[in-house]
């Protein structure tokens, strides 16, 4: 029986794919320094990646690795919490609504664009 704390051999490949995708995502995130912008861009890219007929390895590299390190939930929540602590409740709620609305919208748009590139026999 395999040790549950020890990754299986094929999991190493998956971990490397995520790591290789995460490095450029983190570098872009570090340069942009705008939570709303990176979250919206990341949602659009992730929607596209999910919509396109990519192999799971590419989804790990681009979706989990790149988009996962590009986007930020914790910084967004800190920004909202800071607004709330300053008494700017409406601004915090606006930021939450704007980020979620734009994120869902561009993710759906990216998915629909990617879906158009699927062969007709592949889930279309």
From Swiss-Prot:
Native source species: Prochlorococcus marinus (strain MIT 9313)
Transport is among the record's keywords: yes
| GO annotation terms (biological process) | cellular detoxification of fluoride
Reaction(s) the record says it catalyses: fluoride(in) = fluoride(out)
Give the record's keywords alphabetically: Cell inner membrane, Cell membrane, Ion channel, Ion transport, Membrane, Metal-binding, Sodium, Transmembrane, Transmembrane helix, Transport
Summarizing activity control, the record says: Na(+) is not transported, but it plays an essential structural role and its presence is essential for fluoride channel function.
Family as reported in the entry's similarity comment: Belongs to the fluoride channel Fluc/FEX (TC 1.A.43) family.
Please classify the protein's predominant subcellular localization into one broad category.
membrane
> Which N-terminal stretch is annotated as signal sequence?
none
What job does this protein perform? Fluoride-specific ion channel. Important for reducing fluoride concentration in the cell, thus reducing its toxicity.
Q: Which GO terms label this protein's molecular function in UniProt? A: fluoride channel activity; metal ion binding
**Subcellular location as annotated:** Cell inner membrane
Q: State the annotated membrane topology for this chain.
A: Multi-pass membrane protein
* Positions annotated to bind Na(+): 68, 71
In terms of InterPro entries, this protein maps to: FluC (IPR003691)
**What is this protein identified as?**
Fluoride-specific ion channel FluC 2
- GO CC terms, sorted: plasma membrane
* Transmembrane regions listed in the UniProt entry: 8-28, 34-54, 60-80, 93-113
